[in-house]
UniProtKB/Swiss-Prot annotation:
Pfam families: Homeodomain. Possibly involved in the ontogenesis of pituitary gonadotropes, as well as somatotropes, lactotropes and caudomedial thyrotropes. Belongs to the paired homeobox family. InterPro entries: HD, Homeobox_CS, Homeodomain-like_sf, HTH_motif, PROP1. Residues 1-12 have a biased composition (Basic and acidic residues). This is Homeobox protein prophet of Pit-1. Residues 1-76, 197-225 are annotated as: Disordered. One of its GO terms (biological process) is pituitary gland development.
Length: 225
């Protein structure tokens, strides 16, 4: 009987020792944590945010983002606009030296002048597109009606007829003459014969006159002793 009592008395002690080795739970602390979590407003984290601090405060405001600055718009005087327009008419793409020279004349900064030229080129392209847009819907026949009618030429052009040349009068071989007198007489006779040719018909051009014929024999005649 005494042994059984000792065993029953030792069982609760063993349970207490085993339970002391297990981690103790704090239900009160867990309850407090759930209350704090439920009272805080839900915060959404950005998809690309890291594991650091949240970018949003519990009140819903965003931290670290600067306020957007309002751009200052430059107003140009009529004198400045006149100078800029005249420079734009001369050159639509001025270089850095031209912009600096224009900045000294107008009293503006070089950056402001560069922006003005960019806006002016964009405005001109927009105006050109607005002018060409109504003409894009016209057909070729309607567009040709705006062109002036071409008047027919009162004179008709006919190609000239082919030029016919007569045979050269000196193409045949001439016999050699023993003296210069005979050669001179022959050349004179041939010159008299050339104008006797029939005149060229209308529309045909005669060949240019032949070059003067050189005498075939220039040696003086030998006297027989």
């Amino acid at each position: 009987m005494e042994a059984e009592r000792r065993c029953q008395a030792e069982k609760p002690k063993k349970g207490r020792v085993g339970s002391s080795l297990l981690p103790e739970r704090h239900p009160a602390t867990g309850t407090l944590t759930t209350m704090v979590d439920s009272s805080a407003p839900p915060c959404r984290r950005l998809p690309g945010a890291g594991g650091g601090r949240s970018r949003f405060s519990p009140q819903g405001g965003q931290r670290g983002r600067p306020h957007s600055r309002r751009r200052h718009r430059t107003t140009f005087s009529p004198v400045q606009l006149e100078q800029l327009e005249s420079a734009f008419g001369r050159n639509q793409y001025p270089d850095i030296w031209a912009r600096e020279s224009l900045a000294r004349d107008t009293g503006l900064s070089e950056a402001r002048i560069q922006v003005w030229f960019q806006n002016r080129r964009a405005k001109q392209r927009k105006q050109e597109c607005s002018l060409l847009q109504p003409l894009a819907h016209l057909s070729p026949a309607a567009f040709s009606s705006f062109l002036p009618e071409s008047t027919a030429c009162p004179y008709s052009y006919a190609p000239p007829p082919p030029v016919t040349c007569f045979p050269h009068p000196y193409s045949h071989a001439l016999p050699s003459q023993p003296s210069t007198g005979g050669a001179f007489a022959l050349s004179h006779q041939s010159e008299d014969w050339y104008p006797t040719l029939h005149p060229a018909p209308a529309g045909h051009l005669p060949c240019p006159p032949p070059p003067p014929m050189l005498p075939l024999s220039l040696e003086p005649s030998k006297s027989w002793n």
